[in-house]
Design a protein with these regions (language model features):
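Hydrophobic/aromatic side-chain positions at a characteristic register within alpha-helices
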Residues: 90-93, 148, 410-414
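Extended ligand-binding clefts on enzyme/binding-domain cores
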Residues: 13-46, 53, 57-58, 72-79, ...
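Alpha-helical support elements that line or immediately flank enzyme active sites
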Residues: 86-95, 105
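Long, hydrophobic/aromatic-enriched structural stretches that serve as scaffold segments
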Residues: 98-104, 111, 115-157, 172
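Bacterial N-terminal signal peptides
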Residues: 1-9
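Inward-facing hydrophobic residues that define packing positions of alpha-helical scaffold repeats
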Residues: 102, 147, 163, 170, ...
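A cross-kingdom marker for long, charged
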Residues: 341, 393-397, 405-416, 420-465
């Protein structure tokens, strides 16, 4: 019998050509590849427990009704992790976890009044004290979508009116005028890991304290390009982050937010897909961590007050290579986000299949078990201070977070390489590196999301009958 099985050629993987908005069907690639349903169910449960309840968990409950997700190595809770936790909870029907995370987010992170009403402070200490006031736009993106799904799954009469909460955020993120605070960047404190988001003023005003503050506008979506901002106010509204682009989320808003903006959200989805074409390299499919709205690289990006180059021996030193144009931590999410849009909508299927295979071809050239976690867009490795540090280390690694998202891209691919990436991901262990570095938070969440994708458990949640 075994000899007969070995003689049968392996079935080629064939990406689906229609999205779940149309079919209401979800592909289980792991079962297609030969893993049993029982093995797949056990794996998803195991990885979920690792993130939420295991010895290296990042989810912590507070009292009888709240909880938070922490970037443990940076000792904070971020809108990224809180909204990811809510999305995971609604996907896996964990209502208690969802409600705890939302209550904590609303109490400590969300601005209830003032110029930032409805937005969320991107980082808080685990006691709820804010590290910064400003928002990072991807948090709002996930909060809104997760709340709409919660409304669709559980209704709005179990203690939290999820739809009303989503609609409030959607109303607050529309362009509004405000007068920035004097004294520099309101949310731009020197906080470990990022340096702060959401300044009260742009760089020009920060360098001229005598100038009276000019009225500015705050918005999650840039009105001119219809693309998501890096931050809704200050310096960050002048550019975007490719990893914040999840076009299918806008389609969820268009279908079920009931905010009177359906046509606008569909247009945002269209513009977001067009942007992704522009921001990736045509040979490697790599993108930069941040870029201009036209997809071009950041030019001279720096934090205000920090010099571009230094004088040495009387001669100006060339400015350092701009690491924000490199593929690194934020960028890991892009292949998985494009996978999500492919699975749910498939409105840009031909390009997305090209992207998936081009991206995996590049990673394959670097070694399935050895590819590094940061690259320049041309595929060369960054050097020195151009390497973005994490957890006290400035080092290139083979990180399981990128292993996860590279494997997730197999949902768009038909070449045999994709099987190798999935098998490598299945076998990969989430454990400390030899030098002690370990990221339970970001690596752990991306690992869980990827297994949800590959098992068909990351789904559109329509209103329940």
């Amino acid at each position: 019998m075994m000899s007969l099985l070995l003689a049968i050629p392996a079935m080629a993987l064939t990406p689906w050509k229609k999205g779940a908005f149309e079919t209401n069907q979800y592909r289980n690639l792991l079962v297609e590849m030969g893993y049993t349903q029982a093995e797949v169910d056990a794996k998803v449960k195991e990885v979920f427990n690792d993130v939420f309840f295991g010895p290296n968990k990042v989810y912590f409950e507070v009292g009888d009704s709240m909880g938070y997700v922490s970037d443990v190595k940076n000792h904070d809770a971020r809108t990224e992790g809180m909204s990811y936790g809510m999305m995971i909870a609604v996907q896996l029907n964990k209502k208690d976890i969802f409600d705890r995370l939302w209550r904590w987010s609303k109490k400590y992170m969300q601005h209830q009044d003032g110029i930032r009403e409805g937005y969320f402070a991107w980082s808080c200490r685990t006691d709820g004290t804010r590290n910064a006031q400003g928002a990072a736009s991807d948090g709002e993106l996930y909060f809104i979508t997760a709340l709409i799904f919660a409304s669709n799954r559980w209704g709005n009469d179990t203690g939290i009116n999820y739809k009303a909460e989503a609609q409030r955020i959607l109303n607050c993120i529309q362009p509004k005028e405000y007068t920035p605070e004097r004294g520099g960047f309101g949310g731009f404190g020197g906080f470990g890991g990022f340096g702060g988001f959401g300044g009260g003023q742009g760089g020009q005003q920060a360098n001229n304290q005598q100038q009276a503050p000019q009225k500015q506008k705050m918005y999650l979506i840039d009105p001119e390009t219809k693309l998501i901002t890096f931050t809704p106010d200050g310096f960050g509204q002048g550019f975007t982050d490719p990893s914040y682009h999840i076009p299918a989320f806008y389609e969820v808003w268009a279908k079920w937010a009931d905010d009177g903006r359906s046509d606008y959200w569909y247009e945002c989805a269209k513009k977001s897909r067009e942007f992704l074409h522009k921001c990736v390299d045509q040979k490697t499919a790599l993108n930069g961590d941040q870029c201009q709205y036209d997809g071009s690289e950041m030019q001279g990006f720096r934090f205000p007050g920090r010099p571009q180059g230094q004088q040495q021996g009387g001669a100006p030193q060339a400015p350092p290579r701009n690491g924000n144009n490199n593929f690194r931590y934020d960028s890991w999410r892009v292949p998985m986000n494009i996978t999500l849009d492919y699975e749910w909508s498939c409105a840009d299927g031909e390009w997305q299949r090209w992207y998936g295979e081009t991206f995996q071809n590049f990673m394959y050239s670097q070694g399935v078990d050895t590819f590094m976690d940061q690259f320049r867009k041309d595929g060369t490795l960054p050097e020195g201070n151009e390497i973005l540090g994490a957890g006290g280390f400035r080092k290139l690694r083979h990180s399981i977070g990128l292993v996860a998202t590279t494997a997730a891209a197999s949902m768009m691919c038909s070449h045999d390489k994709s099987k190798e990436f999935v098998d490598a991901f299945w076998k990969a262990k989430h454990e400390p590196f030899e030098d002690g570095y370990f990221d339970a938070y970001y690596d752990g969440l991306l690992r869980l999301f990827a297994f949800m994708h590959l098992s068909g458990n990351y789904r559109i949640i329509p209103p329940q009958k």
